[in-house]
UniProtKB/Swiss-Prot annotation:
Membrane topology, from the record: Multi-pass membrane protein
Listed Acidic residues bias regions: 129-141
ABC transmembrane type-1 domain ranges (all copies): 97-407
Protein name: ATP-dependent permease MDL1
CDD domains, sorted: ABC_6TM_ABCB10_like
Length: 685
């Protein structure tokens, strides 16, 4: 619909052109380029517990099974393919978009017909005034205007039809806006769900290296899920509508301008080449700047998430000022990038506005001369100027459409980077086995963490653990004890060698099904916000109350849970007032694992925060599980109280080699054993 400014302009122009004298100066009002403020959110990230640290500018030292992680730079895709790739994201909403476009065409048709109608109304009114002056008839019949026909209709019928047309236009405009907003919200919801699901399906290589080769951090992933998807949604919903509307308005407006006056149209068309060229260069620059801004926002979110998670450490070391300084640096990076965009946008829109104003003045001057020559009527010039405003606005709108499209492509590149990244380890392929029966064997294992290719962990490692055995892995920090659990859980695949359970190589098994048979408790367990019961049911959703109580008893968590005001319904998590101690968290985490009834239980310093009494009770319960149910127990420990409860001790040296293997008493009684050397060096407590 035409805004009030255009109606005011047409009235002022009509009154001034009756005498074909002085022409008032008309200011063109350009639309402000508003930025879209993106919402932020905090998502809980599930990260695999890897002992590796992410180092920049490193690459995976893998078995070469994946070509997608090649270090060779991919060729830059063509702009056309990038646009079609972006548009394909909206394919599921194609029906809604189709109906929205029908509403858009209807609204645009009504709007584009209005200038011609206004011109005819002006000419009809002017003709009446001229007739009155010629006839000097002051007692004009009141019914005379009704006899004047506008587009073949009497004036009452014409204005009634015009009112109906306005109602239809308003209704279709409502439908357009509602449908496109619906498309945008559906699109962003689907993208966020798809991205989150894709991230959870990734392996540890993704977090250690990822598409960037420097590792994927939680803050950057949050930015891509929350911010980039919003930009894409805007680019594919309202922006597409604005672009199509600009095309329709521009084409129809140009056609009607040619119909009214081809001479004025020729003058108007001279501004199109420079405007289109400027828009093209501006869009290319904006695309790069938009991607840079989104990357800066990702870096800031990453720093925010990291520092807020460690606020107690920051306060302990009194480093608030230095942390704020580093955070301000991230804000400064975003500010500088945004100011570059602001300067570019200011130059682009101010130049376009200047060209538009000069063009309008030129058209008015030339139009008044054509009226004086009798080639145009006042109504024709009014219609032409309104169509000129429409066409000029459409050209500017196309520039803004192209700009927003480039922003969408910049954000889509970061989203596609995650969507198209293929994990090295599939979660769904492979066979499913009902039971994990047999011994665990590591045969000729070579392994290096992908983020530390220069530091090998294992070289030709051979390890045999019998089914139902209670084994403890000991050694100095960094000797590869936790890496054994990482490989057994298949967070990583070895570069060489195989890992078998019975006759099954674990790489041949369905990963999700395989992990459902394992139990893994970390030294620093992650408990989700919610109740204690909800956290335990995370291990087994359909667990009965009897199974929950049994798991609580085995982990000795029932000892403190029953003293809580709300028992199992007690809210826990960082956002709640009820906080658990380290030992209590470990016991809840152990209960969450034991409720799955795993056949292989891996404890990575799982009782390190427990007091001696609680640890003794928990270890006694786990030993009973080992003896009565045949659960294979693999402990990784530095505490002597945990080590001595194991049937077999496997000692690693700093190079990741097994140097001793035997019972606790045998190794402890040998004064020259590596085990005793670890005790003397206080590597074991």
């Amino acid at each position: 619909m035409i805004g009030m400014n255009r109606l005011i302009f047409s009235k002022a122009f009509t009154s001034s052109c009756k005498s074909v004298g002085k022409v008032p100066f008309a200011k063109s009002i350009t639309r402000a380029n508003t930025r879209y403020f993106k919402p932020t959110s905090i998502l809980q990230q599930i990260r695999f517990n890897s002992k590796s640290s992410t180092a920049p500018n490193t690459e995976a030292n893998s078995n070469g099974s994946t070509n997608s992680q090649s270090d060779t730079k991919k060729p830059r895709p063509k702009l056309t393919s990038e646009i079609f790739k972006l548009l394909r994201l909206a394919k599921p909403e194609s029906k809604l978009i189709f109906f929205a476009l029908i509403c858009l065409v209807t609204t645009s048709a009504t709007s584009m017909a209005l200038p011609l109608m206004i011109g005819k109304i002006i000419d009809t009114t002017k003709k009446d005034d001229d007739d009155d002056k010629d006839n000097d008839n002051d007692d004009k019949d009141d019914t005379q205007p009704s006899d004047k026909l506008i587009f073949g209709l009497p004036q009452p019928q014409f204005y009634s039809a015009l009112g109906v047309l306005f109602i239809v236009s308003a209704s279709t405009n409502f439908g357009r806006i509602y449908l496109l907003r619906s498309v945008g919200e559906r699109l962003v919801a689907r993208l966020r769900s798809r991205l989150f699901s894709k991230i959870l399906a990734q392996d540890a290589y993704f977090f250690d290296l990822g598409p960037s080769k420097t590792g994927m951090k939680t803050g950057d992933l949050i930015s891509r899920i929350a911010s980039d998807t919003q930009i894409i949604s805007k680019s594919l919903s309202m922006n597409i509508s604005d672009g199509i509307r600009a095309i329709i308005s521009g084409c129809v407006g140009l056609s009607m301008m040619c119909y009214v006056s081809w001479k004025l149209s020729l003058c108007m068309s001279l501004i199109f080449p420079p405007l289109i060229t400027m828009s093209w260069f501006y869009g290319r620059k904006i695309k790069a700047l938009s991607k840079l801004i989104q990357e800066n926002i990702g870096d800031m979110t990453k720093v925010t998430e990291e520092k807020l998670n460690g606020v107690k450490v920051i306060q302990t070391f009194s480093q608030q000022q230095s942390v704020v300084h580093s955070y301000n640096q991230e804000i400064k990076n975003i500010f500088n990038s945004s100011m570059r965009e602001a300067k570019l946008a200011g130059f682009f829109y101010s130049t376009n506005g200047f060209i538009g104003n000069v063009t309008m003045i030129g058209l008015l001057i030339m139009g008044t001369k054509l009226i004086g020559a009798g080639e145009l009527t006042v109504g024709d010039l009014s219609s032409f100027m309104m169509y000129a405003v429409y066409t000029g606005t459409s050209v500017f709108g196309l520039g803004n459409f192209y700009t927003e499209l480039m922003k969408g492509i910049g954000a889509a590149e970061r989203v596609f980077e995650l969507v198209e990244y293929q994990p090295r380890i599939s979660n769904h392929l492979g066979k499913k086995v009902d039971e994990l029966n047999g011994d665990i064997e590591f045969k000729g294992i070579d392994f290096t963490y992908p983020s530390r290719p220069e530091s090998g962990i294992f070289k030709d490692l051979n390890l045999h653990i019998k089914q139902g055995e209670n084994v403890c892995l000991v050694g100095p920090s960094g000797s590869g004890k936790s890496t054994v659990s990482q490989l057994l859980l298949r967070f990583y695949d070895p570069e060489k060698g195989t890992i078998q359970i019975g006759d099954d190589v674990i790489t041949d098994l369905n990963l999700n099904h395989y992990r459902s048979k394992l139990g893994y408790v970390q030294q620093e367990p992650l408990l989700f916000s919610g109740t204690i019961k909800e956290n335990i049911l995370f291990g087994k959703e359909d667990a009965t109350d009897e199974e929950i109580n049994n798991a609580l008893n085995l982990s000795y968590a029932s000892n403190f849970v029953r003293h809580l005001p709300d028992g199992l319904d007690t809210k826990i998590g960082a956002s709640n007032s009820t906080q658990l101690s380290g030992g209590q968290k470990q016991r809840v985490s152990l209960a969450r694992t034991l409720i799955r009834d795993p056949k292989i239980l891996i404890l990575d310093e799982a009782t390190s925060a427990l007091d001696s009494v609680s640890e003794e009770i928990v270890m006694s319960n786990l030993i009973q599980l080992n003896k009565n149910r045949g659960v294979t127990l693999i402990s990784i420990a530095h505490r002597l109280s945990t080590i001595k409860n194991s049937d077999r001790i496997i000692v690693f040296n700093q190079d990741g080699q097994i140097v001793e293997d035997g019972k606790f008493n045998e190794l402890h009684n040998d004064p020259n054993s590596q085990f005793n050397k670890l005790l003397k060096s206080h590597s074991l407590e």
